């Protein structure tokens, strides 16, 4: 990426944050090859389950060979990669309001 000096963070659901610069793919978990990738990552200790027990809707593959499971749709995660500022501004505003109480 051209912004290698900047770290872009994206929310993948339930307050879990991933570095957008490390993403290789955001895919649906439904196909057999992706299910195999998930199982292999689990066996290697490289699986991160960020679903909080919810149904896996997106599988995020990183450049470090980590596989991250998210309960957020792949399209939503992709949108957050493209437009990350909007999502964080909303999250920060909510947190600031809670801190002021």
UniProtKB/Swiss-Prot annotation:
Q: Which domain of life is it from?
A: Bacteria
Q: Which family does it belong to?
A: Belongs to the RemA family.
Question: What is the name of this protein?
Answer: Putative regulatory protein Csac_2087
Q: Per the UniProt entry, what species is this protein from, by scientific name? A: Caldicellulosiruptor saccharolyticus (strain ATCC 43494 / DSM 8903 / Tp8T 6331)
């Amino acid at each position: 990426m051209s912004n290698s000096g900047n770290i872009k963070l994206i929310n993948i659901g339930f307050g879990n944050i991933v570095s957008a610069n490390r993403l290789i793919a955001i895919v649906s978990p439904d196909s057999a090859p992706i299910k195999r990738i998930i199982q292999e990552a689990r066996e290697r200790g490289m699986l991160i389950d960020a679903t909080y027990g919810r149904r896996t809707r997106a599988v995020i593959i990183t450049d470090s060979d980590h596989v991250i499971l998210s309960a957020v749709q792949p399209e939503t995660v992709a949108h957050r990669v493209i437009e990350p500022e909007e999502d964080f501004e909303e999250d920060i505003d909510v947190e600031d309001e809670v801190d002021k109480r």
